[in-house]
From Swiss-Prot:
The active site is at K66 (proton donor). It comes from Prochlorococcus marinus (strain MIT 9312). Pathway: Pyrimidine metabolism; UMP biosynthesis via de novo pathway; UMP from orotate: step 2/2. The keyword Lyase applies. Its EC number is 4.1.1.23. GO terms for biological process: 'de novo' pyrimidine nucleobase biosynthetic process; 'de novo' UMP biosynthetic process. It catalyses: orotidine 5'-phosphate + H(+) = UMP + CO2. This is Orotidine 5'-phosphate decarboxylase. It holds the Pfam family OMPdecase.
């Protein structure tokens, strides 16, 4: 049996699509949630105060804004959000090595200025919404998703980021390369009874953990459940079991 504390630390509840009051109500229903993902929609609607409110509820925060711009702009954004006290921030690995290096450095500087623990910075590889066909057609790519994930994960690693975000389909491949010194955060997590919605490269929680995922980003499987806490407990059980 795996350690329950460890299992609780592996689940990041995505509250995208909820307003702040709905998010707080969901967290009241799921008191064992330690991690919350704040995406672009909620952050734009509520502003930085959403971070302050969630920190007041003693939650760890993955601020998933997926920064992607020129190095100066990306690093300036990372500097600012690192002063908010978030625990993980995301940047697009495809922005390039310098942008990633500068973003990591800026996150350390911002946190230091605010006397806070620096956040992990993780690189986005290939979004889980892409199927192979859409990826190759829409982005005019000739090689596979796996090849692109490998390239972007290496870029993140070489820039000394703390990890990367990938679909559960690529976790096993990356874990075999980077062992245990690189965070692998996986969205695209669905229960067997769920619709896949707008996700394509999906996997169950237990499968993703077994393949080597560090943390799972789960939203609708919990937030849309008739009993969110029951759904959460079932997820804990599935990743606790050997």
């Amino acid at each position: 049996m795996k350690n329950r504390f460890n299992s609780e630390d592996k689940i990041i509840l995505a509250i995208d699509g909820l307003d702040l009051n709905q998010a707080k109500l969901l967290l009241e229903k799921c008191p064992s949630i330690k991690w919350v993902k704040v995406g672009l929609e909620l952050f734009v609607r509520e502003g930085p105060r959403v971070v302050e409110i969630l920190k007041g509820l003693n939650k760890k925060i993955f601020l998933d804004l997926k920064f992607h711009d020129i190095p100066n702009t990306m690093s300036a954004a990372c500097f600012q959000v690192s002063k908010l006290g978030v625990d993980i921030i995301s940047v697009h690995s495809s922005a390039g090595l310098k942008a990633l290096q500068d973003s990591k450095k800026a996150s350390l500087e911002g946190a230091s200025l605010a006397n806070l623990k620096p956040p992990f910075v993780v690189g986005i590889t290939v979004l889980t919404s892409f199927s192979l066909k859409d990826f190759q057609t829409d982005l005019d790519r000739k090689n596979s998703i796996e090849d692109n994930v490998l390239r972007l994960a290496k870029l993140s690693f070489d820039a000394e980021l703390d990890g990367c975000v990938c679909s559960p389909w690529e976790v096993k491949m990356l874990r075999s390369i980077y062992k245990n010194n690189f965070e692998l955060i996986t969205p695209g997590i669905r229960l067997k009874i769920d619709n896949k919605d707008d996700q394509n490269r999906i996997m169950t929680p237990n499968e993703a953990i077994d393949n080597g995922a560090s943390k799972l980003v789960i939203g609708r499987s919990i937030s849309k459940a008739l009993d969110p806490n029951k759904a959460l407990i079932e997820i804990f059980k599935s990743i606790d079991s050997d």
